Amino acid sequence: MKRLIVDMDDVLADATGQFIDFYEKEFGVRVSRESMNHKDEMERFPDNHEAVYNFTFRNGFFRTMSVNEHSQEVMKALNKNYEVFIVSSAMEFPNSLAEKFEWLTEHFSFLHWRQFVFCGRKTIVHGDYMIDDLPHNLETFNGEKILFTAPHNLQFNHFKRVDGWKEVGELLLR
């Protein structure tokens, strides 16, 4: 069975939407996804970059992210056809490990906890396919690299790209 590595933030979970929501609650300004296109993390919001970064240290930031559309049904099908592992960087922010684990067990209850890998760097993982939104995670991966579209990666075109979970299903479940 082929091994599939899947990222969590901005792939399964809508981390960008969470930043937008937290920013609006904190500063009273709604930032559109479109305004974030082609911008790295520190440029996506007009002001208060340190405060935006600090959202990730707040209780509930990772636990309350929305699930990306169609990810659950496609992941359920992929789990029947691949050896699936959710691999997420979870060491930088104190609450992220526990919150990510709770989020995954709630929203992807058909996956076993042994399929969750929390790490500091993804260079340690190997597999046949990797789906991630961050190009630097894909660059060192040994298998087929699949870039999941997010506002911060639109300028990259040297990986196979998917624009959502329906496209993931079309690519990997044919």
Region roles according to the model:
Residues 1-51:
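Active-site neighborhood of HAD-like aspartate-dependent phosphohydrolases
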Residues 57-87, 93-98:
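Short, acidic loop-to-helix structural element flanking the phosphoryl-transfer center
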Residues 83-85, 129, 146:
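A structural signal for isolated positions on well-ordered beta-strands in alpha/beta enzyme cores
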Residues 83-96, 115, 155-166, 171-173:
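Membrane-proximal envelope and lipid/glycan-remodeling enzymes
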Residues 87-140:
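Substrate-recognition "cap/lid" segment bordering the active-site pocket of phosphatases
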Residues 131-165:
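Acidic, Mg2+-coordinating phosphoryl-transfer loop and its flanking beta/alpha structural elements
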